[in-house]
Swiss-Prot record:
[4Fe-4S] cluster 4 binds at residues 264, 267, 271, 299. Gene3D superfamilies: 2.40.40.20, 3.10.20.740, 3.30.70.20, 3.40.50.740, ADC-like domains, Dimethylsulfoxide Reductase, domain 2. Residues 252-984 are annotated as: Formate dehydrogenase. This is Putative formate dehydrogenase SAS2201. Keywords: 2Fe-2S, 4Fe-4S, Iron, Iron-sulfur, Metal-binding, Molybdenum, NAD, Oxidoreductase, Repeat. Residues 257-313 form the 4Fe-4S Mo/W bis-MGD-type domain. [4Fe-4S] cluster 3 binds at residues 157, 190, 193, 196. SUPFAM superfamilies: 2Fe-2S ferredoxin-like, 4Fe-4S ferredoxins, ADC-like, Formate dehydrogenase/DMSO reductase, domains 1-3. The lineage of its organism: Bacteria, Bacillati, Bacillota, Bacilli, Bacillales. It comes from Staphylococcus aureus (strain MSSA476). [2Fe-2S] cluster binds at residues 37, 48, 51, 63. [4Fe-4S] cluster 1 binds at residues 95, 99, 102, 109.
Length: 984
C-alpha cells in the first residue's frame, strides 16, 4: 500500500498521506486560498466557489478535493486568480461591506478578512438588495440582505446538531435561508442551539445581544446608519483604505470587548467556549473547533442562558437572620456567627452533629475545600454532594464490575460506535450536544440507535428501534439479553477468558432470566428482545448510555451493574466506540465526587476508612481524621429528624426543592439548630437558613470542572464578583481561618496542586497542562499522560481483570388501585434542574414559563380534560397542582413532570418532589424518584397551554435533508462555475 503521494504545490513537491483534504493541506503550508464557506468542523459545503485552484491544469474546488493521486496544484496563476475574483465578486453582490459600523467587525468576519487578504480593491457586480426583512428569534436574528448563502447554518442545523429546521430555498427568485416551511424563526421548530450564529462567517446570522452593542458606532439609528454606510462607500477609492479604517476600529474594540475561555455551568457534557463581555454585559458565547468536548456545538442554555450572572436577584451581601428576618451584614459579622455556632455545636454534640453538602455546580477546587473544611477543621465525614441524588448507583455498578466510576471513553467515541443503546436517558434534552453526536452518527454514518425508555422523547422517535419497558424493570431485560447471548454462544469468549473473572458463577445466576420471564416482567415482546440480543452481540462495537431513568430506582445500582455485565459479556470495553457511559447530569458532578465530597471516600475515591489513606491526609492536614464513614445526604435528613445532626452547611444546592419527599426534608430544616446556605440567590432552601452567604457564579472565578467523560478543563474569570459576593473557595478559606486554621491559598491552582499531591487519579493535573482549551482525562499520570479510553492496560482491580456480578430481580411493576398513575420526571431542554439559573434569562422563561405535567391523549380523554387543564396530583407524601400539556410522548397512565418549577418565585408550588417518597436504592441511598405513583383530581377541564405556542414541542416539524443541497444551486439557470467562466 502506497503510504504517501507526491503533490506539487506552486512548484514545490510535498509527500502527502492519501485521503488528505487538499484545502487543509494547502493551508498547512501557510499558502493562502480563500475559503469562505469552508469550516474545519463541518468540512466541504461547496457553495462559495472561492477556494478554486488549478489541479492538473483544470480549475476545481480545493475544499472538496481529496488527495488520492499524485497531482500538480497551482494557487497563484492568472486563471486561478480570475476564478477566485469572480467568486468573491458574487459574494459581494449579496453582502454589503460596511465593516466599520458593523457589529461583526471584531477581527473574525471571514468575508472582511478574506477580501482583505486576497487584496480585493473593487467589486465587479453591484450589491443587490433582496426583498426580505430581518427575522428576529428570541436569541438570534437573520438578515437576508447580508446573507451570502454559504449554507454553513444549514450544515450546522442539519448535519452537526441534527435539529433539521434550517434549509435554503434555492427555488425562489431570490434564494434565502428558511425555517421549516418558511415561517418566522419564533414560529418554527428551532430549539435555539445557536450554532447557526456560531458558524455564520459574517453578520447575517447573529446573536441578538450583539446587535447594536459591539462597536463604537453600531448602536446608530438604522436610517442614520444607512446614510453613514453610503457616505463611507462613496468616500473611499477602494476597499483597501476602507479595510484599514475598519481594522483600526476593530482594534479599538479589543479594549472594550473581553474574550474569556470558560466551561459551561449546566449539564455534564462540559462544553467549553469563549464568552464575550463588554463591562458586565454578556454579548455572545463562541465555541471553538478546539473545544474538546463540544467542538462548535452548544445548546440553548450554554449559548444563551446567562441571565443569572447579572440578575437583580443576585445576592451581594451576607444575610443573617435576626428576630426571624434576614438582615444584610458585613462579612466579618457573618463569619463570626458561623464560627460561633459551629464551635458551640461541635463542643456540645461532637463533630458528627455538623453536616456539609457540596455543590456539583462549583469547581473541583471548591469541592475539595468543602470536604477539607468538614474533615480537617470540623472533624466529621458528614459530607456529600448531589451525585447521591442521581449518579451514585451508576458509579456503584461500575466499581463492582470494571473498577472506575466514570465513562469508559470520550464523547467522540459515541460517534464511532456501530450501535448506541440509550436506557433511561432523555439525551436530546438533558445532554443535547451528546445527542447531536449520536444523531449525526446515525444520519451520516449508519449508527444504529436503540432506545429503552418509558417515555417517547426525541431520541426514542429517532431510534432505529424503541422499546417501552414497564417502569423499573430494566434489570430483567438486560439480564435476559445477556443470558440469551451466552446461551446461543454469541458471547465474546476470547475477551472473557483474558479479561473477565467470575463468569461461571455469574452465568449460573442468570438461570431465571429467560426471555419469557423478561417479557412478563417488562412487557417487551420476547421476539423484540431476541432480535435486540442478536444485533447487540453481532455489532462491531456497542456503547450503552444511561441516566436517571435507571439510577433513580430502588434497584438503580443493580440495573447499572447489569449494563456493565452485558458490555463485558459482549467484549465491549477497551476499544474505541465501546463501553459504559453513565451520563452525568451536572457540570461538575463527576468532579465533585472525584474531589472527595463523599462520606466514605476522600479524593480520587480513596477510602477514608483505610489506615494508609488517612495517614497520608493526616500528614498533609496536620490533624487526626475521623476513621468512620459519615452520613450521606439521605442519612443527614434522617439524622436531623433523629436528633443526631444539629447543623447543616450547604452551597450551590437547593436541597429543599430537589431532594425527594421535600415535605420531610423541609420539616428537617425546621429542626436544625443552625443552617448556612451559600448561593448566588436567596433560593427556596436559603429561606430556611440562619446565615446566607453570597457566592460568585462560574464567570466570576477561576477553577476547573470535570465533565462526564472524565475530562478536566480550566475556566477563567471573566467578570469581577458582583457586589460583596465571593468565589466559594475564598468563603471556605475565610471560615476555616475564622475557626483557627491557617489556609493561605492565593489562587485555585494551588488547591489543585494539593489535590494532585494526594490523589493518584489526578497526579499529573496542573493548571499549566490545562492552559487554554487543553484538557486531561483521568487517570492522569505524574508526567501528564492521561487516558481517553479506560482499561487499555487492564481493569482497575489488582489482577487487571473485570468482574461479572451476579444479580437477582423481584422488582415487578404493580399499578396501585388508589394511586393509579405512574409519575415520571426529569429534565427539560430549556431549563436546568430546579431552574434557579435558567429562569433568570427572560427569553428562556418565555419559552417555558412554568412547570407542567404531560398527560397522554388516552388519559386526557378518560378524565375529560384538555390542553391547559389544571389538575391536582396526590401521592402518599404530598400533592402538587399543575397545568396539563396533552402529548403522545407519554402513554396510558404514565405522566411526566419536569424538574423545574421556578421555586424562587413560586416556592414549592408544583414541585415534583412534593409527590416523591423517601424510598432509596439500598446500596447508595439514591432516592427512587422514578418510583412514584399518584392519583389525579380535575380542577378545571381546559385552559391556556402551559407551553408558549411557539415552543418546539408544539411545532414539532422536522425537515431533514443532507447538507445544503448545493446541487440545487448548481442547477439554477443563473449559476456558472467560476472555473468554467474562466475557461470560456
Amino acid at each position: 500500500m502506497q503510504e504517501h503521494l507526491v503533490v506539487t504545490l506552486d512548484g514545490k513537491d510535498y509527500l502527502v498521506e492519501p485521503g488528505t483534504n487538499l484545502l487543509e493541506f494547502i493551508k498547512s503550508q501557510d499558502t493562502f486560498v480563500p475559503s469562505i464557506c469552508y469550516n474545519e468542523s463541518m468540512g466541504p459545503i461547496q457553495t462559495c466557489d472561492t477556494c478554486t485552484v488549478e489541479i492538473d491544469g483544470k480549475i476545481e474546488r480545493s475544499c472538496s478535493t481529496v488527495i488520492d493521486r499524485p497531482m500538480t496544484v497551482n494557487t497563484v496563476n492568472n486563471d486561478v486568480k480570475d476564478a477566485q475574483k469572480e467568486a468573491l465578486d458574487r459574494i459581494l453582490e449579496k453582502h454589503m461591506l460596511y465593516c466599520t459600523v458593523c457589529d461583526y467587525n471584531n477581527g473574525d468576519c471571514e468575508i472582511h478578512n478574506t477580501m482583505d487578504a486576497w487584496g480585493l480593491q473593487h467589486q465587479t457586480y453591484e450589491y443587490k438588495e433582496k426583498p426580505y426583512e430581518k427575522d428576529y428569534g428570541p436569541f438570534y436574528r437573520y438578515d437576508p440582505n447580508q446573507c451570502i448563502l454559504c449554507g454553513r447554518c444549514v450544515e450546522a442545523c442539519q448535519d452537526i446538531e441534527v435539529n433539521e429546521t434550517i434549509r435554503i430555498d434555492w427555488d425562489r427568485e431570490h434564494p434565502r435561508v428558511i425555517w421549516d416551511n418558511d415561517v418566522p424563526i419564533n414560529e418554527s421548530s428551532c430549539v435555539s442551539c445557536g450554532q447557526c450564529a456560531t458558524v455564520c462567517p459574517c453578520n447575517a446570522m447573529m446573536e441578538v445581544n450583539m446587535e447594536g452593542n459591539a462597536g463604537y458606532m453600531t448602536d446608530t439609528e438604522p436610517g442614520s446608519l444607512a446614510a453613514m454606510i453610503d457616505l463611507t462607500k462613496k468616500a473611499e477609492p477602494g476597499y483597501g483604505p476602507l479595510f484599514a479604517i475598519s481594522d483600526s476600529e476593530a482594534e479599538m474594540r479589543k479594549e472594550r470587548i473581553k474574550k474569556t475561555k470558560t466551561v459551561c455551568t449546566y449539564c455534564g457534557v462540559g462544553c467549553s467556549f469563549e464568552v464575550w463581555t463588554k463591562d458586565r454585559e454578556i454579548l455572545k458565547v463562541q465555541p471553538s473547533h478546539d473545544s474538546p468536548a463540544n467542538k462548535i456545538a452548544t445548546c440553548v442554555k450554554g449559548k444563551f442562558s446567562w441571565g443569572h450572572i447579572n440578575s437583580d436577584q443576585r445576592l451581594t451581601k451576607p444575610l443573617v437572620r435576626k428576630n426571624g428576618e434576614f438582615h444584610e451584614v458585613e462579612w466579618d459579622e457573618a463569619l463570626n456567627v458561623i464560627a460561633d455556632n459551629f464551635t458551640s455545636i461541635k463542643e456540645k454534640y461532637g463533630p458528627d452533629a455538623l453536616s456539609f453538602i457540596s455543590s456539583s455546580k462549583a469547581t473541583n477546587e471548591e469541592s475539595y475545600l468543602m470536604q477539607k473544611l468538614a474533615r480537617q477543621v470540623i472533624g466529621t465525614n458528614n459530607v456529600d454532594n448531589c451525585s447521591r441524588y442521581c449518579q451514585a448507583p451508576a458509579t456503584k455498578g461500575l466499581f463492582r464490575t470494571v473498577g472506575h466510576g466514570g465513562d469508559s471513553g470520550s464523547i467522540e467515541d459515541l460517534e464511532k460506535a456501530a450501535m448506541s443503546v440509550l436506557i433511561g436517558t432523555n439525551t436530546a434534552e438533558a445532554h443535547p450536544v451528546i445527542a447531536s453526536r449520536m444523531k449525526r452518527a446515525q444520519k451520516l454514518f449508519g449508527q444504529k440507535i436503540h432506545v429503552f425508555d418509558i417515555r417517547k422523547h426525541e431520541m426514542a422517535e429517532r431510534a432505529d428501534r424503541f422499546y417501552q419497558p414497564k417502569p423499573g424493570t430494566d434489570l430483567a431485560w438486560l439480564s435476559a439479553v445477556t443470558k440469551y447471548i451466552i446461551d446461543h454462544d454469541l458471547h465474546d469468549k476470547a475477551f472473557i477468558d483474558e479479561w473477565v473473572d467470575d463468569f461461571d458463577e455469574y452465568y449460573k445466576s442468570l438461570e431465571t432470566f429467560t426471555m419469557a420471564f423478561a417479557e412478563e416482567a417488562t412487557g417487551i415482546p420476547e421476539s423484540e428482545l431476541i432480535k435486540f440480543a442478536e444485533e447487540c452481540a453481532k455489532a462491531e462495537s456497542v456503547v450503552i448510555c444511561w441516566a436517571m431513568g435507571i439510577t433513580q430506582q430502588d434497584i438503580g445500582s443493580d440495573s447499572s451493574t447489569a449494563i456493565s455485565n452485558l458490555l463485558l459479556v459482549t467484549g465491549n470495553y477497551r476499544r474505541p466506540g465501546t463501553g459504559a457511559y453513565p451520563l452525568r447530569g451536572h457540570n461538575n458532578v463527576q468532579g465533585c465526587s472525584d474531589m472527595g465530597s463523599m462520606p466514605d471516600k476522600i479524593t480520587g475515591y480513596q477510602s477514608i476508612e483505610a489506615d494508609d489513606i488517612r495517614a497520608k491526609f493526616e500528614k498533609e492536614y496536620g490533624v487526626k481524621l475521623n476513621p468512620k464513614a459519615g452520613k450521606d445526604n439521605h442519612e443527614m435528613v434522617e439524622g436531623i429528624h433523629d436528633g443526631e445532626v444539629h447543623s447543616l452547611y450547604l452551597y450551590g444546592e437547593d436541597t429543599g426543592i430537589v431532594d425527594s419527599n421535600i415535605n420531610f426534608v423541609q420539616a428537617a430544616f425546621e429542626k436544625l439548630d443552625f443552617m448556612v446556605v451559600q448561593d448566588e440567590f436567596l433560593t427556596f432552601t436559603a429561606t430556611y437558613a440562619d446565615v446566607v452567604l453570597p457566592a460568585s457564579p462560574s464567570l466570576e472565578k477561576d477553577g476547573t470542572f470535570t465533565n462526564t467523560e472524565r475530562r478536566i478543563q480550566r475556566l477563567y474569570q471573566a467578570l469581577e464578583p458582583l457586589g460583596d459576593s465571593k468565589p466559594d473557595w475564598k468563603i471556605f478559606q475565610a471560615i476555616a481561618n475564622r475557626l483557627g486554621f491557617d489556609w493561605n491559598y492565593k489562587h485555585p491552582s494551588e488547591i489543585m496542586d494539593e489535590v494532585a499531591r494526594l490523589t493518584p487519579l489526578y497526579a499529573g493535573v496542573s493548571y499549566d497542562r490545562l492552559e487554554g482549551f487543553n484538557s486531561l482525562q483521568w487517570p492522569v499520570q505524574p508526567d501528564g499522560t492521561d487516558e481517553p479510553i479506560l482499561y487499555l492496560e487492564g481493569f482497575n482491580f489488582d489482577n487487571g481483570k473485570a468482574k461479572l456480578f451476579p444479580l437477582s430481580f423481584d422488582n415487578y411493576f404493580k399499578q396501585d388501585e388508589i394511586y393509579d398513575i405512574h409519575v415520571n420526571n426529569g429534565r427539560l431542554l430549556e431549563h436546568f434542574h430546579e431552574g434557579n439559573m435558567t429562569y433568570q434569562t427572560p427569553m428562556i422563561k418565555y419559552k417555558v414559563p412554568r412547570a407542567f405535567v404531560e398527560i397522554s391523549p388516552e388519559l386526557a380523554e378518560d378524565r375529560g380534560i384538555h390542553e391547559g387543564a389544571e389538575v391536582k396530583l396526590i401521592s402518599e407524601t404530598g400533592e402538587a397542582v399543575l397545568q396539563v400539556h396533552v402529548t403522545d410522548r407519554v402513554k396510558g397512565k404514565e405522566i411526566y413532570i419536569p424538574l423545574n418549577n421556578d421555586a424562587m418565585e413560586n416556592g414549592d408550588l408544583g414541585a415534583i418532589n412534593l409527590l416523591t417518597n423517601s424510598d432509596v436504592d439500598q446500596y447508595t441511598d439514591t432516592p427512587s424518584y422514578k418510583r412514584t405513583s399518584c392519583r389525579l383530581e380535575v380542577i378545571t377541564k381546559r385552559g391556556k397551554s402551559p407551553l408558549n405556542p411557539n415552543n418546539f414541542r408544539v411545532n414539532k416539524k422536522r425537515h431533514p435533508q443532507y447538507s445544503v443541497q448545493v446541487q440545487k444551486k448548481w442547477e439554477r439557470s443563473d449559476y456558472v462555475f467560476p472555473g468554467n467562466q474562466v475557461d470560456k
